[in-house]
Amino acid sequence: MARRWRRRSFLRLGAMAGAAACMGRLISGQTEALAQRMKTPHFPDDNPKWAKTWEAALAVLAGNVKRVPRYDQPVLLEGAVYPGIWLECGPLEGLVYSTLSGFVAPVEGQPTPQQVARANHMAFFALQREDGQLPASVKMTEAGYGQIQMVVPIAATAWELAQQTHDDELLRTAYSACSRWDAWLRRYRNTRGTGLVEGFCTYDTGMDNSMRWKGIPNRCPDADARKSPAIASMPRLCPDLSATVYGGRVALAAMARALGKKSEAAQWERDAETIRRLILDKLYSPEDAAFYDLDAQGQFVRVRSVVIARVLGEHVLKLEHAHDRAIFHDVWERQLHNPRAFWAPWPFPSVAMDDPQFVRPIPRNSWGGATQALTALRTPRWMPHYGKQAELDHLMRQWVEAISRYTEFRQQMDPLTGDFTRADASGYSPAALVYLDFVRRLAGASLA
């Protein structure tokens, strides 16, 4: 719509006399050529809402590309009520944005999606502390170090982006920074000596207002991610945090091989396999077909949450092994694809609907039951890998339909109705990316 408006405006200018007419024709031709170069996906039908929502999503992302005070390149902000980038999601959001480059019109003086994706990684590396700690967030007000807040490993997204863009500097920077980050986590988040990763506070996992963390502070004591609160049940061994480290080590092994560091690659592979086996041995409950936190008193924190999907997100289960195949079968049938648990009309709720801790009606910013855009954005990382493409297609159709109802981009929805929580402003980057990425995937468009 915007391109057509601009073209008509230029044609009206062309009606003027002389040199103005020539200039109008020139600009009009350039604009039309640009429109022809930009790809658009095949929408589900001829309803104009699809194209309207597509253009609105692109506009949201363009508007959320801004500079933060402590880094000199524009980044893609989380948007809405979140003026910054977070370690758990910012790098992945940048990576997904980069895959949409073919649909984003270049604007003179503005960074490309791939440049933005690079900045969404390099900002964290630039603000890494001397001891190896990466910031949990880089906001307009400050960089945050009061929790670790990780889900999709930054090593994995950096490796994917470096492969996509053939960026040797990014590869080398990421390998160094993520190696130091892994060392920091071993030093400060393995206080019980188990080899698994410990959670000290709610924000470590980014699961705000989840009953998983009932009674536990949001941040670490003194806003210091090295400190666990003086609570008898803390610290906890966390399957999702451990899976993040596993995925990071797999990526570090791949980066090391690409850099010709064969012995380091082999060590990363051994370390990855060690933590993978520990996750399955210590943090999986066959009785419930669920992954749980294990507290300092040896008790599972029995809240069936989307932690299960986060473990699968890093491909912790290896289907070539009979033991892992059995776990996946049970997790999928009893939990993730169970319409009483996680396979809601709009998947995946943050807590199983038949869990006593499921929270509904849905409050704002709730990982206690709401279906979150961040969870949806992560699903293509694991569902096709485990042979669930048809189910992913269904999930994607549900999401794009829900978003297109209002042409708004919000954090979370009710898993039973598909109605978004509208307490906060629209303009949430993950939801815009979900719409664009899912429409593209459903249309079978290429990644570039």
Model regions: which residues?
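Short amphipathic alpha-helical coiled-coil/interface segments
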Residues: 54-57, 178, 265-283, 399
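Aromatic-rich carbohydrate-recognition surfaces in CAZymes
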Residues: 83-214, 239-242, 246, 301, ...
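Inter-helical turn/loop segments and adjacent helix faces that build the functional surface
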Residues: 161-172, 252-267, 386
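Extended glycan-interaction surfaces of carbohydrate-active proteins
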Residues: 44-84, 118-144, 191-236, 277-371, ...
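N-terminal export signals
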Residues: 9-31
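C-terminal segment of N-terminal export signals and the immediately downstream linker at the start
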Residues: 3-4, 24-48
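Aromatic- and glycine-enriched pocket-lining scaffold segments that form the walls
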Residues: 236-259, 269
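N-terminal secretory signal peptides
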Residues: 1-9
